[in-house]
């Protein structure tokens, strides 16, 4: 009826695909206008040097009717409360940079994903953000399941093929690939 397809029985969650925290990216400009991501994106691209990442004004927070997303004052990035998120998609629709995606949850709610949407070439992306994917391809080579491809200087993970082995996380020199809800890896002392 609505024209949308729904996967029956597949629970989803909102995922923020930006790791460009206050510590990771320079702020070469000062945005003095309305505190709105939509306005900042139209005016001067916001305060950071990354024209792909989070603008930090919280349009996603304002859009969420379930109080499931908050701005982290330390990082300046939105954080999703996994227990409150209903995967309604309001936050994703509110983001002018399209950094929020709805992803399938698995039984243990473990996820591996690229926390960057910057499509600039390596040196340009790295200058904009210390955590930017630079399209080096190390993750592609490390993945034994051929679940990762490079497209427009950015790594993409095929979640149908990914087996959550986290070899890509270990190989990423930029720490652009995130692993969520995994137990800590054993250290040499354990």
Task: Please place each PLM-identified region on the residue numbering.
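Ferredoxin-type iron-sulfur electron-transfer modules and their immediate structural context
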Residues: 1-136, 140-142, 171, 175-190
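Strongly charged, low-complexity linkers/loops
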Residues: 134, 138, 144-156
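Terminal recognition/anchoring or ligand-binding modules at protein termini
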Residues: 166
